[in-house]
Amino acid sequence: EWTRSILKYYRLLGSPKITSILITHGHTDHIGGLDRIQEEVQAPVRCHPKLANKLGKLLSCPELVIPLRSDEFITTGGRIKLQALFTPGHEIDHICYYLESDSVMFTGDTVLGASSTSVRDLTDYLNSLNLLKNYKHEIVCPAHGPVVLAPQGADLVNWQIQHRLKRENQIIEALNKGLRQVPEITDHIYPTTLKQGLRPSAERNVMTHLEKLIKDGKIKKITSKFELQS
C-alpha cells in the first residue's frame, strides 16, 4: 500500500526527475516495493555497502545499486546536499541523512518520533547517537512517528542517550536486588501498563543492555542468568 501511495504522489507531482533513491537500512518496511519504485523513477539506489548485495538481488539490474561512502555528500537536482552518516545500532547497515542547509536530520529508525527504537547492538547505537549529536539540527524527520520540530528536535538525540543510560542503571539496580532472569528484570524496569504486544520488544531491549554490560566487563553470564562482576 505504501508503494502505491508513493508512486501516486510521484505522478501527481508530474513525475519529476529523481537523481537517487536513498535507503536508510534493509528492514522490509523500508525496502519493500523498491523494485517497483526504481522501475518507475529510473534512478540509482544508494545504500550502505553491507546492504548493496541484498538490494541488488531485488532489482532487475544489480548495477543500479551504488554503495555510499561514510560521510559522502549526495547532491540533488536542485543542488541540495545531503550527507550520509553511517549509524549502526538499530541495524548494522543503517544510514541517517543530514541536510545541513535546513538543519534537518533524517534519522530512519535510529531515532523515532514518539518512542524508542529496537536496538541490535547497544554499543554501536550509543556511538551513533553521539555522532548525530555532533551535527547541529533543529528538526528530526524519523521513519516512524511525527516529525519533531524545534526546539524539541535539537534535544531528541540527547534524550535518547539519557534514556538508554537510565535503562542501563535500572538493570544494574535489578541485578543488585538479586534478579537474574530477563523476564524478571523486564518486570522490574518496565511499567505494569506495558502493552502485551510490546513485551517481546521490551525483553529484547533488556537482553541488548545485558550484552553491552558483558562487553563492558560489568556483568557475567552463568547459563541463562546474569550477575554483577565481583
Residue ranges and their predicted role:
Residues 173-230:
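C-terminal regulatory/interaction regions
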Residues 31, 125, 206:
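Aromatic/hydrophobic pocket-lining residues that form the small-molecule binding cavity
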Residues 81-170:
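Metallo-beta-lactamase
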Residues 1-79:
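Active-site HxH/HxHxD metal-binding segment of metal-dependent hydrolases
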Residues 24, 87, 213:
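Conserved S/T- and glycine-rich ATP-binding loop of Class I adenylate-forming
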Residues 57-60, 116-120, 197-200:
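Short, solvent-exposed loop/turn segments at secondary-structure boundaries
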